[in-house]
């Protein structure tokens, strides 16, 4: 299937129409950003690696009954996906305290917690993707309570599957963010991507960061970290 009219460009991906109104082509770029776009750069072949990682993970989730927008990988950088209307929300799942939460509440990064923390942010670059709660989301018309409940239910299942998957390849899933959308049938689907761009992934033995924090924090060996994630996921499908 060939790319049609250009639809949209985000920080890490481009979207194109196809000859089917319900399908789009998602193109993965090498661009990298941090701090809501304040820091910009590129990671060599990041688009290729993130396309592969998302395809592997979304296929695994589909096999376990999670409905996603993913249809198939087309080539190194492109994948065919169902067209969805995205909820303007980021759903954040925290299994260990890290990143912005550590700073926000004054708890040391790496602190283990007895429960899983779910957060939502309003996806809006102008306002810095602010943290909101369910009542804000409903009042702002971003989602209904029923939609949020379904989203949280799906997210919990995704977290359990991802934790097990990464644990089996020697990686701790610290936290991650995901997005959801509705297709033409009105079904709520997991959308966007699940990659080292959107997850915090720490090596179980060494604690080494295998994610975009290497870019955010100028830790170096960024491409190597992404390659390692691809390698482990590919070796143990």
From Swiss-Prot:
Record keywords, A-Z: ATP-binding, Ligase, Nucleotide-binding, Purine biosynthesis
UniProt catalytic activity: 5-amino-1-(5-phospho-D-ribosyl)imidazole-4-carboxylate + L-aspartate + ATP = (2S)-2-[5-amino-1-(5-phospho-beta-D-ribosyl)imidazole-4-carboxamido]succinate + ADP + phosphate + 2 H(+)
Metabolic or biological pathway, per its Swiss-Prot or TrEMBL entry: Purine metabolism; IMP biosynthesis via de novo pathway; 5-amino-1-(5-phospho-D-ribosyl)imidazole-4-carboxamide from 5-amino-1-(5-phospho-D-ribosyl)imidazole-4-carboxylate: step 1/2
EC number per UniProt: 6.3.2.6
Domain of life: Bacteria
UniProt record, GO biological process: 'de novo' IMP biosynthetic process; cobalamin biosynthetic process
SUPFAM superfamilies named among the record's database cross-references: SAICAR synthase-like
UniProt xrefs under Pfam families: SAICAR_synt (PF01259)
GO molecular function annotation: ATP binding; phosphoribosylaminoimidazolesuccinocarboxamide synthase activity
Cited CDD domains: SAICAR_synt_PurC (cd01415)
Enzyme class: ligase
Entry-linked InterPro entries: SAICAR_synt/ADE2_N, SAICAR_synt_PurC, SAICAR_synth, SAICAR_synthetase, SAICAR_synthetase_CS
Signal peptide interval: none
Key word Ligase present: yes
HAMAP family: SAICAR_synth (MF_00137)
Assigned protein family: Belongs to the SAICAR synthetase family.
UniProt-listed PANTHER family: MULTIFUNCTIONAL PROTEIN ADE2, SI:DKEY-6E2.2
Protein name, entry field: Phosphoribosylaminoimidazole-succinocarboxamide synthase
Source organism: Fusobacterium nucleatum subsp. nucleatum (strain ATCC 25586 / DSM 15643 / BCRC 10681 / CIP 101130 / JCM 8532 / KCTC 2640 / LMG 13131 / VPI 4355)
């Amino acid at each position: 299937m060939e790319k049609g009219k250009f639809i949209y460009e985000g920080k890490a991906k481009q979207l194109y129409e196809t000859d089917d109104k319900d399908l789009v082509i998602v193109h993965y770029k090498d661009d990298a950003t941090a701090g809501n776009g304040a820091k910009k750069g590129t990671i060599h072949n990041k688009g290729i690696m993130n396309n592969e990682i998302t395809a592997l993970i979304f296929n695994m989730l589909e096999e376990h009954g999670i409905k996603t927008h993913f249809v198939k990988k087309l080539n190194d950088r492109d994948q065919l996906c169902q067209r969805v209307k995205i909820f303007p929300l980021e759903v954040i799942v925290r299994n260990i305290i890290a990143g912005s939460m550590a700073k926000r509440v004054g708890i040391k990064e790496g602190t283990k917690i007895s429960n899983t923390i779910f957060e939502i942010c309003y996806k809006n670059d102008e306002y810095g993707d602010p943290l909101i709660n369910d009542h804000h989301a409903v009042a702002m018309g971003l989602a209904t309570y029923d939609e949020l409940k379904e989203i949280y239910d799906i997210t919990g299942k995704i977290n359990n599957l991802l934790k097990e998957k990464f644990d089996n390849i020697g990686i701790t899933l610290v936290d991650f963010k995901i997005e959801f959308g509705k297709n033409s049938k009105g079904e709520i689907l997991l959308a966007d991507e699940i990659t080292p761009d959107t997850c915090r992934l720490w090596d179980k033995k060494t604690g080494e960061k295998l994610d975009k924090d290497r870019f955010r924090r100028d830790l170096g060996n960024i491409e190597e970290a992404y390659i390692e994630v691809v390698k482990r996921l590919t070796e143990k499908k």
